[in-house]
């Protein structure tokens, strides 16, 4: 069935030589290429992770700065509104004081004019009363 002659060891030797040649010519360069490609992918993946971490840190920092800016702007707006309200309240108080002063001055003037009118009216009433009495009683009895 099988003949054991020199061809079998020769075929085994050829197989080993072919394996060594293929290993030297094909498998080692291919392995080196695959290893270098894996290293390249790993380094790119690490760089991508680092850049992603930096981007996330920057995003967090910008969000914090944005929050701080919003808080500061809200504080500035609140301060400006409070100041505007204070100024408006002062102006209103001043206007009310001026209105009250004008009202009091007008009331004094009205009271003064009323007193003058009453004095003039009393004088006229006295004069008219005297005239009426003179007409009724005569001018000699009224003096």
Swiss-Prot record:
Pfam families: ATP-synt_B. InterPro entries: ATP_synth_b, ATP_synth_B-like_membr_sf, ATP_synth_b/b'su_bac/chlpt, ATP_synthase_B_chain. It is found in: Cellular thylakoid membrane. It is a single-pass membrane protein. Keywords: ATP synthesis, CF(0), Hydrogen ion transport, Ion transport, Membrane, Thylakoid, Transmembrane, Transmembrane helix, Transport. The keyword Chloroplast does not apply. Coiled coil: none annotated. One of its GO terms (molecular function) is proton-transporting ATP synthase activity, rotational mechanism. The chain crosses the membrane at residues 6-26. It comes from the Bacteria. GO terms for cellular component: plasma membrane-derived thylakoid membrane; proton-transporting ATP synthase complex. Belongs to the ATPase B chain family. F(1)F(0) ATP synthase produces ATP from ADP in the presence of a proton or sodium gradient. F-type ATPases consist of two structural domains, F(1) containing the extramembraneous catalytic core and F(0) containing the membrane proton channel, linked together by a central stalk and a peripheral stalk. During catalysis, ATP synthesis in the catalytic domain of F(1) is coupled via a rotary mechanism of the central stalk subunits to proton translocation. PANTHER family: ATP SYNTHASE SUBUNIT B', CHLOROPLASTIC. F-type ATPases have 2 components, F(1) - the catalytic core - and F(0) - the membrane proton channel. F(1) has five subunits: alpha(3), beta(3), gamma(1), delta(1), epsilon(1). F(0) has four main subunits: a(1), b(1), b'(1) and c(10-14). The alpha and beta chains form an alternating ring which encloses part of the gamma chain. F(1) is attached to F(0) by a central stalk formed by the gamma and epsilon chains, while a peripheral stalk is formed by the delta, b and b' chains. This is ATP synthase subunit b'. The gene is atpF2.
């Amino acid at each position: 069935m099988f003949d054991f002659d020199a061809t079998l060891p020769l075929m085994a030797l050829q197989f080993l030589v072919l394996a060594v040649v293929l290993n030297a010519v094909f498998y080692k360069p291919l392995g080196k290429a695959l290893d270098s490609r894996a290293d390249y992918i790993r380094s790119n993946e690490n760089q991508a992770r680092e850049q992603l971490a930096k981007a996330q840190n920057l995003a967090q920092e910008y969000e914090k700065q944005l929050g701080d800016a919003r808080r500061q702007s809200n504080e500035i707006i609140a301060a400006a509104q409070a100041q505007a309200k204070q100024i408006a309240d002062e102006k209103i108080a001043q206007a009310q004081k001026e209105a009250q002063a004008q009202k009091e001055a007008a009331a004094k003037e009205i009271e003064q004019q009323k007193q003058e009118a009453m004095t003039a009216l009393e004088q006229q009433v006295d004069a008219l009363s005297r005239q009426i009495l003179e007409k009724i009683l005569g001018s000699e009895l009224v003096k």
